[in-house]
Amino acid sequence: MNSSKTTPQRLAVSIVCSLAAGFCAASLYVTFRHGFNGEAMMTFSVFAFWYETPLYMGHATPVFYCGLAIVVSTSIVVLLSQLIISFRNHEHHGTARWAGFGEMRHAGYLQRYNRIKGPIFGKTCGPRWFGSYLTNGEQPHSLVVAPTRAGKGVGVVIPTLLTFKGSVIALDVKGELFELTSRARKAGGDAVFKFSPLDPERRTHCYNPVLDIAALPPERQFTETRRLAANLITAKGKGAEGFIDGARDLFVAGILTCIERGTPTIGAVYDLFAQPGEKYKLFAHLAEESRNKEAQRIFDNMAGNDTKILTSYTSVLGDGGLNLWADPLVKAATSRSDFSVYDLRRKRTCVYLCVSPNDLEVVAPLMRLLFQQVVSILQRSLPGKDERHEVLFLLDEFKHLGKLEAIETAITTIAGYKGRFMFIIQSLSALTGIYDDAGKQNFLSNTGVQVFMATADDETPTYISKAIGDYTFKARSTSYSQARMFDHNIQISDQGAPLLRPEQVRLLDDNNEIVLIKGHPPLKLRKVRYYSDRMLRRLFECQIGALPEPASLMLSEGVHRDGQDLSQQAAVTEAQGLGDIDSIPNNMEAATPQNSEMDDEQDSLPTGIDVPQGLIESDEVKEDAGGVVPDFGVSAEMAPAMIAQQQLLEQIIALQQRYGPASSHSVK
């Protein structure tokens, strides 16, 4: 069925036939060179030209040279005619064929181990041999489709993390990627971070998505905050569609207000809206307090609405993603940033987003926000001379994150900003369930390397068969006559058939995979298993030392107010009746003792995070700082946690110096 296998044989047969035709033509010339007569016809022989050759006569004659010219010219004409006819017939029904290893190696997709810089998708030979590995070549984005236990983790994800020369942001659903590859990444020079907000032992680094907005000029904060709100707050259910815009506006106003107060965290926004009392009174109070015109406008508009409408807005806001910050662990894990997105292209960084399968749906808003914010920051400016590293977004089981509109758009543009996507799903129907047909086609058309392992659904095998295409073959049919016993007719015709039928895709064995590469024929390769491959196993076993685990995150009293958890406080808020606006707690006053305690420890703590350029710490700012410290603290006995607390304090002081006093209600 593979036409590429018979091409050399057909070419050899064509050459032999053309030479034979040329030799016969030369024999005709030798026989009839004196004219056509009966005697010449009686003595004709196909070997007549042989008797005129120097091999037979011992010397060359003019007849030999003329005959030789006839052989060459006739052979060329016959050979070209055969090739033209063959190609015309071959292209009539399709030209599908399997790619050869040589042509893919020449195109740069098959590389030796010591030349691998990109992801690894497969291998040309078994695990014990020194074969070539399939990488992405010139294609920036890739798609891996494989069901459960098909080998996508051991064959693509882990080998890629062991060998990729660049920064990686990996969605680690089971936490095994961090355990299996983090030491290799660290040994390769990466700065390794583990972001696991719901880790049972609270071992997680922190990331605050609002700090990037707080560091921007005031005129850009509103636009970036709206983008943040669009990425985080999503409508849950049909009834929420009419209130989603208002809920996002509330979130925008809350972020801008918390930046003014010196508490640039989403947890502070949750606390702001979880205060007891009538919402219209709260919004009216915030409109008077805020100095940001956009925040004032939003709060004024909200304060003029009916209580039921305000309840709908806040309900959609909470259900859309903000209620996640009722969890003290999430609030603490997003109170500061241990890594900077701006360093991803500047130095090799590996960020593992670890979450258990049971918690993935819960923290999906936070993970979705992180991915989309990183994409947005990378596309703000083209890479500089010192930003030479590519950034790989490794999205395993990314369908659980929901619809990623920013990534759906960025897949067509982010390659110019050194961004690379690797999407991993179990079947193409997973894309159909989240994105419409246009969105699914957008992913399929922009992923230049598509790897398929044995699938059991109906959509994926059909797509593979159609994408590979048809080939042309010679079909022979024989018909017999009923009137005459031995009378039959044989017909040979060109017909087309799929190079790989859908049922053959389903029967693909466990050791092979099919790869579709844009602009090249399909490729059939062996799967890679890092634990048995002679090169990858050596790299994996060379990992030594302890895992680069972060210190346990300690929760302070700021997370529990008056012995009541904030998640419970949210429930109490709904049960509150009418409340006086004066009863709204001033978070800034509540934070004053914490600020004083932190100031006492400041001189003994080293400096951690870089303060944005142009922001200088001063004693006057410390004295006038009236902003609220986020509800996150540390144990005084643990030095790493104390350093993190000092980092947060420096950020707050720098932000307050830039934007002025946090509020007219600050405690003096």
From Swiss-Prot:
**What are the TM regions of this chain, as residue ranges?**
12-32, 67-87, 153-173
Any one GO CC term of this protein is: plasma membrane
Subcellular localization is given as: Cell membrane
Return the CDD domains for the record.
TrwB_TraG_TraD_VirD4
Residue stretches in coiled coil: none
Q: List the disulfide bonds.
A: none
> Topologically, how does it sit relative to the membrane?
Multi-pass membrane protein
Q: Which InterPro entries match?
A: P-loop_NTPase, T4SS-coupling_protein, TraG/VirD4
Read off the Pfam families from this record.
T4SS-DNA_transf
What Gene Ontology terms for biological process does this UniProt record contain? protein secretion by the type IV secretion system
Sorted alphabetically, which keywords does the UniProt record give? Cell membrane, Conjugation, Crown gall tumor, Membrane, Plasmid, Transmembrane, Transmembrane helix
Record's family? Belongs to the VirD4/TraG family.
Q: What is this protein called?
A: Protein VirD4
Look up and give the organism this protein is from. Agrobacterium fabrum (strain C58 / ATCC 33970) (Agrobacterium tumefaciens (strain C58))
Q: What gene name is listed for this protein?
A: virD4
